Amino acid sequence: FPIRKPEQIVDILKEKGLPLPTKLMLEGDELPYTEYVRLAGLFPDAEVVNGTPLIRQARSVKTAIEIEMFRRSGMAHAKAYEQIPFAYYPGMTDIEFSIEIERLMRLQGCLGIFRVFGRSMEIFMGSVLTGDNAGYPSPYDFALGGRGLDPALPGGADKTPLKEGQSVMVDLGGNFNGYMGDMSRVFSIGKLSEEAY
């Protein structure tokens, strides 16, 4: 049955002569409070329990189809990364290089958006870091930093020019067919110095 809004579920169950649930499991850790109350209110006689732990456990076990989808996602991601050295041209900034890499990813089928936790956390594709910006700390709970283009998103590329003799860290996520992966590689523009700094 096509369902446009949750309220239709009650009508369909009644129409088909099916019993209303006595126990309702909702993702209590992830649903906004108002949505939780709305859904629970559809079945006022049902016991409502937090189903998040069970749902997470079920999602942690992958079917053969899901494993194949991850494999295909990884292959598309790797295919885009193989083209990265050819996307560089002298005079580019890190943001220009990032845009070119994102273009390569999208051409391989990357969806370009990443929902990573519940309904309210999405991340950008990732970071291309070089020069002093590569050592800039992150305000977030992940390894890479960078100043970013704006305080609204303080992470990633910041228009640093790419220069001969520099390393370039490319760490982009890929969301292909709804299955996400992450890939990090370090490239160099010309020969790198033996010393890190």
Located regions from the model:
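Active-site neighborhoods and metal-handling regions in enzymes and metal-associated proteins
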Residues: 1-197
